[in-house]
């Protein structure tokens, strides 16, 4: 009877050990599953993090490129502003120069017209401005005791012989030929000035008032 009880106790211990081993294996299996699941989740997290890092890297690259582009645009706009201001200053200087030149021209023209009026009165000569510069046309009045003598003339401006002959004739009538010639010369200058093309000076023609630049493509 004692031997049977001893075997039962041994069997119980073996059975207990076996059951414990079963439980340990079951726990080990669960732990392995949890570890596998954890590793799987960790791998997913790493892959997600890697994708996120790649996106962040791309975004940082884009931000850097945009920042560099913005810097180029700011520099470009700075140069452009300086150029526009320089052009404005040149334009103002050119306008002032043209204004001064016009004032001088008008002053000179007034002086010439006044001189022409004086010479015309002194020599008694009227010169037809409309015929100039192609022809020298007009009339000289020679005062007389009873009546004035009219000396009309209508010559080609290049007819030197005819003009010399006319001057000799006027000189014989006591007309101051030097003043008469000066009158014709000044009238010729006025006629040539009136018929000259009113083109702006070369500097004004080259002056820039409007700049068309593609602001979407700044220079590097």
From Swiss-Prot:
Q: Which domain of life is it from?
A: Eukaryota
One biological process GO term for this chain?
A: cell division
Q: Does the keyword Cell division apply?
A: yes
Q: Give the family, as the similarity comment puts it.
A: Belongs to the SPC25 family.
Quaternary structure, from the entry = Component of the Ndc80 complex, which is composed of Ndc80, Nuf2 and Spc25.
User: Keyword Secreted, does the record have it?
Assistant: no
Q: Name one GO cellular component term.
A: Ndc80 complex
Please report the organism this UniProt entry assigns to the protein: Drosophila orena (Fruit fly)
Q: What is this protein called?
A: Kinetochore protein Spc25
Q: What does this protein do?
A: Acts as a component of the essential kinetochore-associated Ndc80 complex, which is required for chromosome segregation and spindle checkpoint activity during meiosis and mitosis. Required for kinetochore integrity and the organization of stable microtubule binding sites in the outer plate of the kinetochore. Participates in SAC signaling that responds specifically to disruptions in spindle microtubule dynamics. The NDC80 complex synergistically enhances the affinity of the SKA1 complex for microtubules and may allow the NDC80 complex to track depolymerizing microtubules.
Coiled-coil ranges per UniProt: 79-114
Keywords from the named record:
Cell cycle, Cell division, Centromere, Chromosome, Coiled coil, Kinetochore, Meiosis, Mitosis, Nucleus
Location of this chain's protein in the cell: Nucleus; Chromosome, Centromere, Kinetochore
